[in-house]
């Protein structure tokens, strides 16, 4: 792509200069954008434009470093008699030269386009004529979606050419969209195709994708390439990571990339968005990278310039998270430390509604197509399980010491592990993650602080009364409602739980592997709901697992004895 070609020259030309050597690189006319050529002009010492007609060859110096003469930047004509280039000065000679330029420009009218865009435009033109070759599809999947053979097979099965073109239209830069984005769009296509009722309850997405080439462009344009190479050595893998992380947090984006960021933010207006990691290796078969890379909420309030600065800092945070110690260790332990890990980014509109000054989804969480957490002997693990919370789904993904998500096994969705109201209240979600539109930040609120802005119908779906606690208060002359989060009303909606079970079952069947998903659900007072499928990845399953006979263990050697439960 033009972005990566520009990066090549930005890295190579200074290196050749240090080596005190000379190298010539030919560029084919009309194959690259004006922007790409401008990046090369900025870094090279010498840039020559060469034109050839039937009998004439012209050379036009566009940049000559540290040298100047009165005729240097004139076009020069090649003489076949003596093999010399001489300046074109006469009126006749200049008219022939400009006629040649005009003829050549007619053959290359689209130099405002990236070479990658021209490839897609050509594929689109062929498709309108009823042609879409397997080679073209293979190129698109390889360069944009995934190189994993199992995922490629699924993409070919469920994607149409229109899907590829739509995805490209929503890309910033070029390169791959990464594992998380690929998993999200693929899961949606599978559900749209295989589950008839999915479309009626599916919340459409309007995500953008920052291509993986932008990650390398950011590194190169901030003069971090050699540091990146040093960090990828055995000696520098951990030791150079902190320095590279600091540089990634403080770099600047090229002007053409910033302009595309601004166009995207204008599209979203002041709707909150989330900037999510979507690396090459993320969310593929065998490597989930769960929680290793960052996702950053942008509440997206303020002036366009303020929103752009917040967004750029969020992208920097995601890029820098590739150098987090936990991510480096994860890659090292799995033998991925020598693999090229590039970071693409998935930008999604935050699903939800406004409640006073706060914004959040009705509920959110994660789902597993196979549940290893079985608290009743007759539960069906293959029915799947949901971890569901009120507000943003971070409480379902990131474990906290005070908050407990609601667990729902999908064969008995309303069943709970606790038998008393006191237990249900004690082991419930106490704090809600929301976006504060006044303070322009994500924050955690105690449930009681959020209650005044919640409508009654919403409370009935997500909350329960603690009648025992209310009675104790009444005995002391205190009359007030005591609420706690249970999601019982939502889980009593068989339409919702039935759809979630079908989504999990269908994805596992198509993937030929257990999966986990991230989702949000928004409801209204009529009981209608929409589900937003945010992520899907294959669950890692160990090949070394086996049945263990516990009867041979001596009683004195047992620390914990648990039956029909999980720990």
What is each stretch, according to the model?
Residues 21-25, 241-249, 481-493:
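Short, basic, glycine/proline-bearing loop/turn elements
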Residues 30, 151-153, 158-197, 252-567:
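Conserved mixed alpha/beta core segments that line enzyme active sites in large multi-domain catalysts
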Residues 2-30:
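Substrate-engagement module of ASCE P-loop NTPases
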Residues 60-67, 219-226, 288-292, 361-365:
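Short, surface-exposed amphipathic charged segments that create phosphate/polyanion-binding patches used
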Residues 111-162:
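His/Asp/Glu-rich acidic catalytic environments and adjacent acidic regulatory segments
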Residues 67-107:
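C-terminal regions of RecA-like/P-loop NTPase motor modules
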Residues 27-80:
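Phosphate-binding/switch region of NTP-binding enzymes
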Residues 164-230, 234-255:
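A conserved helix-loop-beta module that forms one wall/lid of the active-site cleft
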């Amino acid at each position: 792509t033009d972005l990566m070609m520009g990066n090549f020259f930005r890295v190579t030309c200074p290196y050749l200069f240090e080596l005190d050597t000379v190298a010539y690189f030919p560029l084919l006319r009309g194959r690259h954008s004006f922007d790409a050529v401008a990046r090369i002009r900025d870094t090279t010492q010498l840039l020559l434009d060469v034109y050839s007609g039937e009998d004439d060859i012209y050379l036009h110096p566009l940049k000559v470093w540290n040298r100047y003469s009165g005729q240097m930047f004139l076009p020069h004509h090649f003489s076949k008699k003596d093999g010399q280039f001489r300046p074109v000065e006469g009126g006749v000679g200049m008219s022939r030269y400009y006629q040649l330029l005009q003829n050549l420009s007619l053959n290359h009218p689209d130099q405002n386009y990236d070479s990658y865009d021209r490839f897609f435009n050509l594929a689109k033109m062929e498709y309108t004529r009823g042609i879409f070759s397997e080679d073209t599809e293979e190129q698109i999947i390889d360069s944009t979606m995934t190189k994993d053979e199992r995922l490629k097979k699924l993409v070919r099965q469920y994607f149409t050419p229109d899907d590829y073109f739509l995805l490209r239209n929503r890309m910033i830069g070029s390169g791959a969209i990464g594992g998380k984005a690929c998993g999200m769009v693929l899961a949606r296509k599978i559900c749209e195709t295989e589950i008839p009722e999915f479309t009626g309850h599916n919340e459409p997405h309007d995500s953008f994708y920052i291509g993986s080439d932008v990650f390398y462009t950011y590194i190169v344009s901030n003069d971090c390439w050699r540091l990146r190479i040093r960090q990828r050595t055995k000696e520098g893998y951990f030791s150079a990571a902190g320095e590279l992380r600091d540089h990634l947090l403080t770099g600047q984006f090229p002007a053409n990339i910033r302009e595309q960021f601004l166009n995207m933010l204008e599209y979203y207006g002041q709707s909150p968005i989330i900037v999510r990691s979507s690396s090459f290796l993320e969310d593929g078969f065998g490597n989930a990278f769960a929680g290793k890379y960052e996702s950053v909420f942008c509440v997206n309030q303020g002036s366009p310039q303020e929103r752009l600065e917040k967004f750029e800092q969020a992208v920097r945070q995601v890029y820098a998270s590739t150098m987090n110690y936990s991510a480096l260790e994860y890659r090292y332990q799995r033998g991925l430390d020598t693999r090229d890990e590039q970071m693409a980014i998935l930008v999604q509109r935050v699903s939800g509604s406004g409640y006073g000054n706060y914004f959040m989804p009705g509920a959110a969480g994660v789902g597993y197509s196979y549940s290893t957490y079985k608290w009743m002997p007759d539960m069906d693990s293959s029915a799947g399980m949901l971890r569901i919370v009120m507000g943003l789904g971070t409480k379902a993904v990131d474990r906290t010491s005070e908050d407990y998500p609601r667990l729902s096994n999908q064969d008995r969705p309303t069943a709970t592990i606790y038998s008393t109201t006191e237990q249900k209240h004690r082991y419930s979600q106490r704090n809600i993650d929301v976006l504060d539109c006044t303070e322009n930040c994500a924050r955690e609120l105690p449930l009681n602080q959020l209650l005044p802005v919640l409508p009654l119908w919403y409370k009935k779906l997500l909350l329960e009364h603690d009648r025992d606690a209310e009675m104790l208060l009444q005995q002391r002359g205190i009359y007030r409602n005591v609420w706690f989060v249970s999601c019982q009303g939502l889980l009593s909606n068989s339409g919702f739980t039935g759809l979630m079970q079908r989504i999990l079952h269908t994805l596992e069947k198509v993937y030929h592997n257990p999966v986990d998903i991230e989702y949000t659900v928004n409801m209204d007072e009529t009981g209608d709901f929409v589900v937003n499928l945010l992520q899907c990845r294959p669950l890692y399953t160990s090949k070394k697992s086996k049945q263990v006979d516990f009867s041979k263990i001596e009683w004195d050697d047992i620390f914990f004895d648990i039956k029909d439960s999980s720990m």
